[in-house]
Amino acid sequence: MNYYSTSIAKLIEELSKLPGIGPKTAQRLAFFIINMPLEEVKSLSQAIIDAKEKIKYCRICYNITDTEVCNICSDKERDHSLICVVSHPMDVVAMEKIREYKGVYHVLHGVISPIEGVGPEDIKIKELLDRVKNGNVKEVILATNPDIEGEATAMYIAKLLKPLGIKVTRIAHGVPVGGDLEYTDVVTLSRALEGRREL
């Protein structure tokens, strides 16, 4: 039995399609939205429409932007000889939060995943190779996630880049700050040991 009016039920249904939003959260959001002033609701819906219509991909790095070239790629202060390869635009946000990386990025828009039918041709690997061949690139940092697909993607890209004579590195993985060694899995501990550095 449906306890809601058709319009509320539809709003809940649409909200639950968002990642991380289950039925309960969707219901809570729906009731919050219907209690908002109409002008705020219109502003919210317009912001969603504007973002969808105006956002595109940077023609250089494929990060999301509302201009032809994103702010990072157009920044002359950045080191354009250093490219950090990430899987998704949100990874750029995560890297930028640490405020230590001064190079540029390349967003793959996915990882190689045969189980999900995603091959190398389905993500922005060719574009990365073209960029490296045509640019003055000295180092490519592979910063895909440390899961099976991320590792496979990094290894595949490294194999393609090695013959081009540029330095190819992988971000270190290891024990999280505040983590206990006894609760850390074997693979993470092994990588932490491999990625150790001199003090």
Curated annotation (Swiss-Prot):
Q: Does the keyword Signal apply?
A: no
Q: What is the lineage of its organism?
A: Bacteria, Bacillati, Bacillota, Clostridia, Thermoanaerobacterales
Give the record's keywords alphabetically: DNA damage, DNA recombination, DNA repair, Metal-binding, Zinc, Zinc-finger
Where do the Toprim domain residues begin and end?
81-176
Q: Which family does it belong to?
A: Belongs to the RecR family.
Q: Which GO terms describe its biological process?
A: DNA recombination; DNA repair
Q: Which InterPro entries match?
A: DNA_Rcmb_RecR, Hlx-hairpin-Hlx_DNA-bd_motif, Rcmb_RecR, Rcmb_RecR_Znf, TOPRIM_dom, TOPRIM_RecR
**Function noted in UniProt:** May play a role in DNA repair. It seems to be involved in an RecBC-independent recombinational process of DNA repair. It may act with RecF and RecO.
Highest taxon above the source species = Bacteria
What PROSITE patterns does the database record attribute to this sequence? RECR, TOPRIM
Q: Which gene encodes it?
A: recR
Sorted alphabetically, which CDD domains does this protein's record hold? TOPRIM_recR
In residue numbers, where are the C4-type zinc fingers? 58-73
Q: Name one Pfam family in it.
A: RecR_C
Q: Which NCBIfam families match?
A: recR
Kindly provide the name given to this protein in its UniProt entry: Recombination protein RecR
Q: Which GO terms describe its molecular function?
A: DNA binding; zinc ion binding
